[in-house]
Curated annotation (Swiss-Prot):
InterPro entries: Spore_III_AB. The lineage of its organism: Bacteria, Bacillati, Bacillota, Bacilli, Bacillales. It comes from the Bacteria. It holds the Pfam family Spore_III_AB. This is Stage III sporulation protein AB. The gene is spoIIIAB. One of its GO terms (biological process) is sporulation resulting in formation of a cellular spore. The keyword Acetylation does not apply. Disulfide bonds: none annotated. Coiled coil: none annotated. NCBIfam families: spore_III_AB. Keywords: Sporulation.
Amino acid sequence: MLKLLGAVFIVVATTWTGFEMAKIYTERPRQIRQLRAALQSLEAEIMYGHTPLHTASQQIAKQLAQPVSTLFSAFSDQLDKGSDSAKTAWEQSLKKVWDTLSLKKSEYEVLKQFGETLGIHDRISQQKHIKLALTHLEASEADAEQAQAKNEKMIKSLGFLAGLLLILLLM
């Protein structure tokens, strides 16, 4: 009876580990979609609402789920504190929040390049830079969805199978 209970515990623990490891593949496309929605909202606020950047960032942060909302909240806070420029505020916010995101280096570079253009162009040029970032994020989203389809189920299965292997080795 005790061996059976231990075996069940091992399978549950390794399966849970597999699901947690697979969560990265689930979170990345979701966070990229949120970033795209945020940039589209930012574009609308800049182009049609004529909203200041810090106010638009606050509003966007309220609309998004964690951890992506934290990026825009931190950006708004940096701007409110009187950061040197929007570029500096964006970079500091991105560095602060980056470890909580499930994104790759390529998405970091897209967001960093986008931040370099924030607040230094007129509205039309800013809109073009937002659309460029959206295009890059769209390609990253397709890549993330492909990686999710390819790897998520395998990692979940490996967690379960690792538990079964461990049980067989211990018996």
